[in-house]
Amino acid sequence: MSCATLPAEARLHRPSEFTAALKGRRLARGALFIVSAAPATSAPACARLGLVIAKRYAALATTRNAIKRVLREAFRHRRQALPAQDYVIRLHSKVGPLSLTALKRAARTEADAHFGRIAR
């Protein structure tokens, strides 16, 4: 397996982890996403990611999956620079009638901006 992948320990798995991060501090809000964070609860302190992409905001499964892929990839690239916290990225508004390519570009641009701001 490649060392460039996002390992299982870098993701949130339990509902309690998601709840704690969502109740934590809101770090960023953009046109599409809200980023919330809480102190890391895992033993090896590292940045971990959870995604909440609701069907009400992105009706098609292909759209939801594309958004999740783009967000995971953006997080994977910035993971080492981020503080050791549990992050949850939540889609908070309806996705407009964009092509999948335009949606991926918009999601990546916003994710990079949020992670860049958090890493500073």
UniProtKB/Swiss-Prot annotation:
Entry EC no(s): 3.1.26.5
Keyword GTP-binding appears in the UniProt entry: no
Any GO BP: tRNA 5'-leader removal
Pfam families: Ribonuclease_P
EC category: hydrolase
Catalytic reaction(s) noted: Endonucleolytic cleavage of RNA, removing 5'-extranucleotides from tRNA precursor
Record-level Gene Ontology MF annotations: 3'-tRNA processing endoribonuclease activity; ribonuclease P activity; tRNA binding
Keywords attached to this entry: Endonuclease, Hydrolase, Nuclease, RNA-binding, tRNA processing
Gene Ontology annotations for the cellular component aspect, listed alphabetically: ribonuclease P complex
Classification via PROSITE patterns: RIBONUCLEASE_P
SUPFAM superfamilies membership: Ribosomal protein S5 domain 2-like (SSF54211)
Family membership noted in the UniProt record: Belongs to the RnpA family.
Quaternary structure and interacting proteins, as annotated: Consists of a catalytic RNA component (M1 or rnpB) and a protein subunit.
Cited function: RNaseP catalyzes the removal of the 5'-leader sequence from pre-tRNA to produce the mature 5'-terminus. It can also cleave other RNA substrates such as 4.5S RNA. The protein component plays an auxiliary but essential role in vivo by binding to the 5'-leader sequence and broadening the substrate specificity of the ribozyme.
Annotated protein name in UniProt: Ribonuclease P protein component
Organism: Bordetella avium (strain 197N)
